[in-house]
Amino acid sequence: MKAILLLAIFSVLTVAICGVSQNYGNVRYNYTELPNGEYCYIPRRRCVTTEQCCKPYDTVNNFAACGMAWPEDKKRKVNECYICDNELTLCTR
């Protein structure tokens, strides 16, 4: 019983320190409806054009883009939405 409790505490601490995998960075984006009735695509979602990707609230310092990336299965490159920082050229993926 003590081992199970220690394992549970360790798991909670690990998640609290490392965070979760759905963290898109500290860049906030505007989740809006597109003209075709769909909603914009969040970062890491596959896209065809940049217009499909959610735009950041701060458009002066950040921009959204649709670019090539290796998916998790690493079979072939696909287009995914990004939000990038203008000055640092860092993108959340």
From Swiss-Prot:
Endpoints of the signal sequence: 1-18
Disulfide-linked positions: 40-54, 40-81, 53-66, 84-91
Subcellular location: Secreted
Pfam family, one: Cys_Knot_tox
GO molecular function: ion channel regulator activity; toxin activity
Keyword vocabulary terms for this entry: Disulfide bond, Ion channel impairing toxin, Knottin, Neurotoxin, Secreted, Signal, Toxin
Keyword Ubl conjugation listed: no
Top-level taxonomic group: Eukaryota
Listed GO CC annotations: extracellular region
Known tissue expression: Expressed by the venom gland.
Membrane-spanning parts: none
Biological function: Probable neurotoxin with ion channel impairing activity.
Domain writeup: The presence of a 'disulfide through disulfide knot' structurally defines this protein as a knottin.
Protein name: U8-theraphotoxin-Hs1a
Protein's organism: Cyriopagopus schmidti
